[in-house]
């Protein structure tokens, strides 16, 4: 997209923030694409050293002044809210996010601890898993506020990602 803007002669300074593996993203998959980004961007910001290292794979000139790591942050909790016996899973309901492991595990847990419940927030139309239990509640995709409200009720949040998670925002939340 940056190259498109440059070709259109857009006079602006570009700052890119990478929060996923750049080698899997259109416009930064190849060494030449990434070298063009270095040349044409004022700053490149990465959410972790891992993401930055991936970006520079195969590139000799690192341009340290243009490239920085800024870790995502949260506001510290001053008072922990009273929690319920709820285990939460939030995210896409697919294999890369580990939903297949969560689903089979949560059924065993809910069978053993009948006073616990689990909520699942998210969806995934491309993959279908059918985990059912009377204490397993699917909420679908919710707004950020509703998701955070449910997080505040849950005692446990599970993030079993199966891919190279550059910086799991779900775990941070």
Placement of each model-derived feature along the sequence:
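Acidic donor-binding loop of glycosyltransferase active sites
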Residues: 152-166
């Amino acid at each position: 997209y940056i190259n498109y803007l440059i070709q259109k002669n857009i006079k602006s300074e570009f700052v890119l923030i990478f929060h996923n593996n750049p080698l899997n993203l259109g416009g930064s998959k190849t060494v030449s694409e990434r070298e063009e980004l270095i040349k044409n961007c004022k700053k490149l910001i990465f959410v972790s050293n891992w993401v930055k290292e991936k970006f520079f794979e195969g590139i000799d000139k690192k341009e340290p002044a243009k490239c920085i790591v800024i870790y995502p942050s949260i506001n510290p909790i001053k008072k922990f809210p009273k929690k319920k016996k709820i285990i939460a899973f939030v995210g896409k309901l697919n294999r890369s996010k580990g939903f297949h492991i969560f689903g089979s595990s949560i059924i065993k847990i809910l069978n053993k601890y009948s006073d616990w419940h689990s909520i699942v927030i998210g969806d995934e139309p491309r993959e279908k898993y059918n985990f059912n239990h009377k204490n397993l509640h699917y909420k679908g995709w919710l707004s950020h506020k509703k998701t955070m409200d449910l997080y505040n009720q849950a005692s446990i949040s599970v993030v079993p990602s199966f891919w190279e998670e550059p910086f799991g925002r779900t775990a941070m939340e």
